[in-house]
């Protein structure tokens, strides 16, 4: 049975049991700041299990792409450790429970119509206090000696939903390990008993302060299951390990051809095949290789795979060449890999080249981290973790240079790092505690805000945190669109949130009671501006994908009344010319006055009309209808937000900025409608301030004969081009001012030298003091001091530059220590200063004490 057939059989079986088939979500979690990857089938459904949102379907099945990297060191060493894997799942949210879940698992695994596993090959574990589960399996015909009670079979990861679980193992026979079921009981690594399915009965609210027996029952009991596709394929295809299944072996065969080496189970083949799949799927979902968070994880995988390639004789970049066979291997279920394989290969080649450059300097970096011919454990780990130098390569350098390494300490640090990663992976799927009062509130509330901004309505529920109305024009903060502002009976609404069952909660000051009639009103002007910016965001996204490529995916957005923000992935720097073209194309669509079409379609109708669109989105979000927003055929998207009725409502679109917020992630800020001029002006203010300061400085430098012509900014056109023009203009003016300043300096220097007799005493001596009161740039005075010192071959020159509010002292010397002289002199008048033996500078604001300083210096220089 092929992996494609296994997936299809799983989905077909649960569809026959009235489960909704949900498309795999992206590997990059949405709205999960602390979660690096989707790492379990339940991850995208978490919001339904903890009651944050009401599920559109109570029964769901999926094949979920997952990434886990906490056991990366085991990949290639064991038969079934992977960084990328597919989890087959079936889920019940407040619908069926233990008995049905166990019956479904039994039927799918043992029925001749489905997987047809021999019953005697199955071993089942269950929570030792869960007698219901034990009895259900027994009733289905599982032998008692195949049912194993375990204290560890209880799933909990902190406060929130938790419960007992039952695990299903397949016995591959004594040829894989002579030991018996003690392998399961003692949780020993082995190739005989393969865990193929875990069913979690989520029925309690975990309270870490209490023993399990005291946990409270959940108001909504759930079923969460996961079966590893790779493990099922290994059993059903009768292969020695997962790597010989059709989920890996075509890639291994491509590696054989590339290396001219026969695969006989070598770790390098397995590591490359595993890591490459992870890289291909992650990049396809919009992940970027960076030096932080998930990007750093991918970079480590790439470098580890590249280093394994070197062990097979692949000294040049090769991973990018394996993208087509990877896409071909997975195309039956993931057609998008073939569409995007060119861009994926381009990203990989770019990163492989960067790694090659790293390796060229790796030995030098290695030598820089040695202490007395020893590499400490801390520095070993730093080279491995920070610089990305593979462990094997570090050991090779050490052996070649006869360097002692603290390998044990490195292993300890690596172990600690991996444990931390495991803790993070576990905590990442932590769920919120179910809010029972919200979950149990089922009275419907109608949102009428797409077409109505005001309404007479009544209060149907009062919570501590706010009130729910029978119907409401208020849009809650969701989907990147900010919430509405407004009033209920002249009382300001402070916050709008959506409850688990779809109603809108209005946080509002004042006393309200259930049944009370009220008048709800949103701020129309702000709502309109929000709607315009939402439509502009759709246009921007479509143009970005057209200009930069289909690999581009939204990484976050914020739609407000004064601006919009759109975050996206891209692997190259975005030029100003590209941004101007993007802005131009959005404005062209606005000027075409294209109607914004809103459709509410049933799932079957939407699948007929927009099959590709639904394929690209998570259909599990929607129950019986989907809302589709289309702007001609240029932008078609699933969206629940508010929009303009026509692109002409946007009037104009201006990009305000485009910046890299992290490696490979960019953020565009833009505005439309009457916000353009005001927002653009605000962006231009810093440049106007710079020009004002430049003008003031130019005036202070000007002389009767030297005038600096400050040029004004070019006219504003309400475009990103204005920002570029202002940047260019300021830069040109600053460069011109630098040249002018140099010219003015030369002018003053020349004049001062020509008039030197006006500043010198009648008699020139080797030790000389000068006092200058005429206003001069300090640089001119320093030039003049050097000129006089050298021209007259002086030993010491002490110059006092006297201004109304301060005095500056300069000293140049061949004999006395200039720095010490300045320090002693200014200390007499509470000044400060210093320098070296030959040149020093100081100053004071106590201008009335000049004579005290001069007398001191005269004494020091022995001047009469």
Swiss-Prot record:
Functional summary from the UniProt entry: Catalyzes the attachment of alanine to tRNA(Ala) in a two-step reaction: alanine is first activated by ATP to form Ala-AMP and then transferred to the acceptor end of tRNA(Ala). Also edits incorrectly charged Ser-tRNA(Ala) and Gly-tRNA(Ala) via its editing domain.
Similarity comment: Belongs to the class-II aminoacyl-tRNA synthetase family.
Gene: alaS
Cofactor: Zn(2+)
GO CC terms, sorted: cytosol
Catalytic reaction annotation: tRNA(Ala) + L-alanine + ATP = L-alanyl-tRNA(Ala) + AMP + diphosphate
CDD domains to which the protein is assigned, alphabetical: AlaRS_core
Species annotation: Onion yellows phytoplasma (strain OY-M)
Domain observations: Consists of three domains; the N-terminal catalytic domain, the editing domain and the C-terminal C-Ala domain. The editing domain removes incorrectly charged amino acids, while the C-Ala domain, along with tRNA(Ala), serves as a bridge to cooperatively bring together the editing and aminoacylation centers thus stimulating deacylation of misacylated tRNAs.
BP-aspect Gene Ontology terms: alanyl-tRNA aminoacylation
Binding positions for Zn(2+) per the UniProt entry: 534, 538, 639, 643
Compartment(s): Cytoplasm
Gene3D superfamilies in UniProt: 2.40.30.130, 3.10.310.40, Bira Bifunctional Protein, Domain 2 (3.30.930.10), Threonyl-trna Synthetase, Chain A, domain 2 (3.30.980.10)
Cofactor detail note: Binds 1 zinc ion per subunit.
GO MF, one example: tRNA binding
Main localisation: cytoplasm
Keyword Lipid biosynthesis assigned: no
Name recorded for this polypeptide: Alanine--tRNA ligase
Alphabetical UniProt keywords: Aminoacyl-tRNA synthetase, ATP-binding, Cytoplasm, Ligase, Metal-binding, Nucleotide-binding, Protein biosynthesis, RNA-binding, tRNA-binding, Zinc
Transmembrane segments: none
Enzyme class: ligase
EC number: 6.1.1.7
């Amino acid at each position: 049975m092929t992996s494609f057939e296994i997936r299809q059989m799983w989905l077909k079986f649960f569809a026959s049991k009235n489960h909704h088939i949900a498309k795999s979500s992206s590997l990059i979690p949405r709205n999960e700041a602390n979660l690096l990857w989707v790492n379990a089938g339940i991850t995208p459904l978490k919001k339904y299990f903890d009651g944050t949102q009401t599920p559109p379907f109570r029964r769901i099945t999926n094949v979920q792409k997952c990434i886990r990297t906490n056991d990366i060191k085991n990949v290639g060493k064991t038969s079934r450790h992977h960084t990328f894997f597919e989890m087959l799942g079936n889920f019940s949210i407040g619908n069926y429970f233990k008995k049905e879940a166990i019956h479904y698992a039994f039927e799918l695994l043992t029925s001749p119509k489905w997987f047809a596993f021999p019953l005697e090959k199955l071993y089942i574990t269950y929570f030792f206090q869960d007698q219901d589960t034990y009895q259900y399996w027994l009733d289905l015909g599982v032998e008692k000696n195949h049912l194993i009670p375990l204290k560890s079979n209880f799933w909990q990861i902190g406060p929130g939903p938790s419960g007992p679980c039952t695990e299903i193992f397949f016995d591959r026979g004594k040829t894989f390990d002579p030991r018996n079921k003690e392998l399961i009981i003692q949780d020993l690594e082995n190739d005989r008993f393969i865990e193929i399915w875990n069913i979690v009965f989520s029925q309690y609210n975990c309270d870490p302060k209490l023993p399990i027996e005291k946990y409270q029952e959940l108001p909504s009991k759930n079923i969460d299951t996961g079966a590893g596709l790779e493990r099922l394929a290994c059993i059903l295809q009768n292969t020695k390990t997962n790597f010989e299944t059709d989920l890996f072996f075509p890639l291994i065969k491509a590696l054989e051809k590339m290396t001219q080496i026969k695969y006989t189970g070598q770790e390098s083949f397995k590591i490359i095949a595993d890591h490459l799949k992870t890289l291909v799927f992650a990049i396809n979902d919009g992940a970027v290789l960076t030096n932080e968070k998930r990007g750093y994880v991918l970079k480590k995988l790439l470098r580890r795979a590249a280093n394994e390639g070197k062990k097979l004789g692949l000294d040049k970049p090769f991973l990018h060449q394996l993208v087509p066979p990877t896409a071909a291997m997975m195309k039956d279920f993931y057609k998008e890999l073939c569409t995007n394989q060119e861009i994926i290969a381009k990203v990989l080649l770019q990163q492989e080249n960067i790694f090659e450059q790293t390796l060229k300097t790796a030995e030098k970096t290695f030598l820089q981290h040695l202490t007395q011919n020893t590499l400490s454990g801390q520095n070993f780990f730093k080279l491995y973790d920070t610089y990305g130098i593979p462990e094997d390569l570090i050991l090779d350098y050490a052996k070649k240079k006869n360097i002692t390494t603290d390998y044990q300490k490195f292993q300890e640090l690596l172990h600690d790092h991996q444990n931390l990663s495991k803790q993070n992976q576990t905590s990442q799927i932590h769920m919120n505690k179910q809010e029972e009062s919200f979950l149990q509130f089922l009275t419907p509330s109608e949102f009428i805000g797409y077409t109505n901004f005001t309404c007479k309505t009544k209060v149907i529920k009062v919570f501590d945190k706010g009130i729910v109305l029978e119907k409401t024009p208020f849009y809650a903060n969701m989907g990147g669109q900010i919430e509405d502002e407004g009033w209920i009976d002249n009382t300001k609404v402070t916050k709008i949130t959506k409850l688990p069952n779809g109603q809108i909660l209005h946080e509002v000051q004042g006393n309200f009671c259930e049944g009370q009639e009220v008048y709800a009103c949103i701020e129309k002007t702000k709502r309109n501006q929000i709607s315009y910016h939402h439509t502009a965001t759709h246009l921007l996204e479509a143009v970005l994908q057209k200009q930069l490529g289909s690999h581009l995916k939204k990484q976050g957005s914020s739609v407000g009344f004064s601006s919009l923000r759109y975050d996206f992935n891209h692997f190259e720097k975005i030029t100003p010319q590209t941004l101007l073209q993007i802005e131009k194309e959005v404005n062209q669509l606005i000027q075409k006055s294209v109607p914004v079409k809103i459709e509410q379609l049933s799932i079957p109708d939407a699948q007929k009309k927009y099959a590709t669109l639904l394929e690209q989105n998570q259909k599990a979000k929607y129950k019986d209808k989907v809302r589709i927003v289309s702007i001609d055929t240029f932008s078609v998207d699933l969206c629940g937000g508010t929009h303009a009725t026509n692109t002409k409502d946007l009037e104009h679109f201006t990009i305000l900025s485009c910046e890299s917020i992290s490696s490979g992630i960019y953020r565009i800020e833009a505005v439309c409608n009457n916000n353009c001029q005001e927002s653009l002006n605000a962006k231009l203010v810093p440049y106007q301030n710079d020009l004002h300061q430049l003008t003031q400085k130019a005036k202070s430098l000007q002389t009767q004969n030297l005038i600096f012509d400050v040029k004004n900014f070019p006219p504003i056109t309400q475009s990103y081009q204005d920002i570029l023009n202002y940047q260019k203009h300021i830069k040109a003016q600053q460069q011109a001012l630098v040249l002018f300043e140099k010219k003015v300096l030369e002018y003053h220097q020349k004049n001062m030298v020509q008039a030197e007799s006006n500043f010198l005493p009648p008699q020139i001596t080797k030790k000389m003091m000068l006092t200058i009161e005429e206003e001069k740039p300090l640089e001119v005075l320093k030039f003049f001091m050097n000129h006089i010192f050298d021209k007259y071959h002086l030993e010491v020159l002490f110059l006092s530059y006297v201004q109304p509010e301060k005095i500056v002292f300069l000293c140049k010397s061949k004999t006395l220590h200039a720095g010490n002289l300045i320090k002693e002199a200014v200390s007499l008048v509470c000044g400060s200063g210093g320098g070296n033996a030959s040149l020093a500078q100081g100053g004071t604001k106590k201008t009335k004490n000049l004579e005290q300083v001069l007398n001191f210096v005269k004494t020091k220089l022995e001047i009469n």
